[in-house]
């Protein structure tokens, strides 16, 4: 097979009209036929998402691949710790096996923090022996994000044992240290962490990159750090990569890494520096089996019409055309439905918050959700009371939030949250990072109970209720994913998202994605686990009441 076009060489920063000869999935020969020819298509390496949780797309790897290739993505660096928290090592193996049914190049990591903390109930544990077993697999390319950065700084034995194993297997170690700066950041880096995708200010990113860390610029459905961090690309092009981290199917339909390429170019960044971040750096850092348009490389590349819009015309993986003009050629595959879900329906009274009538001038701690960020703030408000019950107050945008243990029957943990903007009803989800218990937010206990029970009855899913209306997107695989065609799921999710905004009143850009992170204790400041309200600064439980 032969393909011709203006070939971008990311190593010598040139564009020459060339002809590729492809044999047995590899580039056998590159013939340079002259200088760049305006009007002819351009050939460049495929895009790589340098850090993503496939599960957060709500799709199996096979279905994720179908959507991603349309946008020129040929590979991902994928941390399977979401399903790992539900099913353990078996979940990681499930992701590997499902991904191998497609030509897409998934590089999975060995989850380093399952469960993420000891302050929540997960469905499984991935210990040191499990990490050793996973790192020994050829499909496992790295030790996935070390979220327990306090454990690194204090040299927790289990944490250090996992890091030591990764070094012994000569596999990179991903970091995760939001807000860590200065000497502590240096100690974290010195321990072996090579990347961070959690920087949310330019100053934090600059501090870490100057200390030798690779910075992954994240733009997902909930966390959006592109605007703050993209200036780093100018001075540190060899240390920057692009990633989505968590991307819901509706936004994956719209675009992927190609969107970040367009945005960076629109800001005036150098073409080859941008493509280095989007294509080259992840392949080199993680030693991915992904071609970079050199003789002998796997024939992984994309064809675009121009270098401004980067509209992807064709995507090739191992010499096979997997997408053309917006249509995926990756097969629509069904997958095995594995799960772990064992809790009973709840009653409205289970979500009641009682106040001691003898308490003087009470106040409640309130989680402040921040649109476009995973971090939260801790606020304090006077409670709204009905017969010694603290209730949600939609007029002040003070809603109830709950986390319900899905692995065993237990009393729900209940607290209060601001900035969801709901005027009525409730949302619930079995996608609740990282342990994936059921998490819900709502305006009244009856609605919260209805939304939670829809998820319980389906053994996983996203739900929204108001008045007599009830909507559900089932997620039968680990309570996280579905193997339904990704385009169909994207429409279902879009309809659910619109209901949450137009009917319930949510003011967030991505209410379900934001909700899913309100139980992620390793991101400060105030979060909720199935065991109670958690202060991410002091790293301990705290009371709903402040006085």
For each feature predicted by the language model, list its residue ranges:
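Divalent metal-coordination and catalytic microenvironments
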Residues: 25, 40, 51, 72, ...
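Active-site microenvironment of metallo-dependent hydrolases
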Residues: 1-18, 23, 31, 69-71, ...
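Short, ordered loop/turn segments at secondary-structure junctions
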Residues: 80-83, 111-112, 148, 178-179, ...
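Divalent-metal coordination cores built from histidine and acidic residues
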Residues: 65-172, 472-474, 511
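Short coil/turn connectors at secondary-structure junctions
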Residues: 1, 38-39, 43-45, 71-74, ...
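Histidine/acidic residue-rich metal-binding segments in metalloenzymes
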Residues: 91, 125-145, 151-216, 221-242, ...
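Active-site neighborhood of phospho(di)ester-bond hydrolases with catalytic His/Asp-centered motifs
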Residues: 44-51, 78-81, 109, 144, ...
């Amino acid at each position: 097979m032969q393909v011709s076009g203006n070939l971008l060489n990311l190593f010598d920063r040139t564009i020459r009209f060339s002809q590729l000869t492809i044999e047995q999935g590899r580039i056998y020969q590159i013939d340079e036929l002259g200088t760049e020819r305006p009007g002819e298509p351009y050939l460049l390496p495929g895009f790589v998402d340098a850090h993503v949780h496939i599960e957060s797309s709500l799709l199996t790897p096979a279905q994720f691949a179908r959507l991603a290739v349309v946008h020129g993505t040929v590979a991902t660096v994928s941390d399977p710790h979401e399903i790992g928290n539900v099913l353990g090592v078996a979940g990681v193996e499930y992701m590997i096996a499902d991904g191998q049914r497609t030509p897409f190049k998934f590089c999975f990591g060995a989850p380093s923090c399952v469960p993420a903390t000891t302050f929540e109930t997960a469905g499984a544990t991935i210990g040191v022996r499990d990490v050793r077993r996973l790192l020994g697999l050829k499909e496992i390319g790295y030790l996935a994000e070390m979220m327990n950065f306090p454990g690194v700084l204090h040299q927790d034995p289990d944490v250090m044992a996992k890091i030591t194993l990764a070094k012994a297997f000569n596999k990179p170690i991903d970091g995760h240290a939001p807000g860590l700066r200065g000497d502590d950041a240096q100690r974290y880096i010195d321990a072996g962490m090579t990347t961070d995708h959690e920087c949310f200010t330019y100053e934090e990113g600059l501090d870490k990159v100057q200390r030798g860390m690779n910075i992954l610029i994240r733009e997902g459905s909930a966390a959006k750090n592109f605007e703050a961090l993209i200036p780093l690309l100018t001075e540190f092009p060899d240390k920057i990569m692009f990633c989505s981290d968590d991307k819901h199917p509706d936004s994956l339909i719209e675009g992927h890494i190609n969107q970040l390429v367009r945005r960076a170019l629109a800001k005036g960044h150098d073409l080859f520096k941008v493509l280095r971040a989007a294509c080259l750096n992840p392949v080199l850092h993680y030693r991915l089996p992904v071609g970079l348009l050199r003789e002998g490389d796997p024939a992984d590349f994309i064809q675009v019409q121009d270098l401004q819009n980067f509209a992807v015309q064709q995507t090739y993986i191992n010499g096979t055309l997997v997408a053309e003009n917006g249509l995926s050629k990756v097969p629509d595959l069904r997958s095995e439905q594995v799960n772990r879900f064992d809790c009973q329906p709840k009653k409205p009274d289970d979500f009641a918050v009682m106040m001691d009538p003898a308490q003087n001038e009470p106040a409640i701690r309130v989680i402040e959700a921040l649109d476009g960020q995973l971090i939260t703030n801790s606020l304090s408000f006077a409670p709204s009371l009905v017969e010694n019950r603290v209730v949600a107050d939609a007029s002040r945008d003070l809603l109830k939030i709950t986390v319900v243990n899905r692995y065993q029957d237990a009393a729900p943990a209940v607290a209060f949250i601001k900035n969801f903007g709901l005027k009525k009803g409730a949302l619930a989800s079995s996608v609740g990072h990282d342990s994936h218990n059921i998490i819900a937010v709502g305006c009244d206990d009856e609605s919260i109970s209805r939304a939670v029970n829809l998820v319980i009855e389906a053994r996983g899913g996203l739900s929204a209720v108001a008045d007599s209306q009830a909507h559900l997107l089932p997620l039968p695989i680990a309570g996280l994913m579905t193997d339904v065609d990704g385009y169909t799921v994207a429409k279902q999710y879009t309809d659910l998202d619109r209901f949450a905004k137009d009917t319930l009143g949510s003011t967030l850009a991505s209410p379900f994605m934001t909700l899913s992170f309100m139980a992620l204790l390793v991101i400060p400041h105030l979060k909720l686990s199935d065991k109670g309200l958690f202060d991410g600064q002091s790293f301990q439980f705290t009371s709903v009441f402040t006085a």
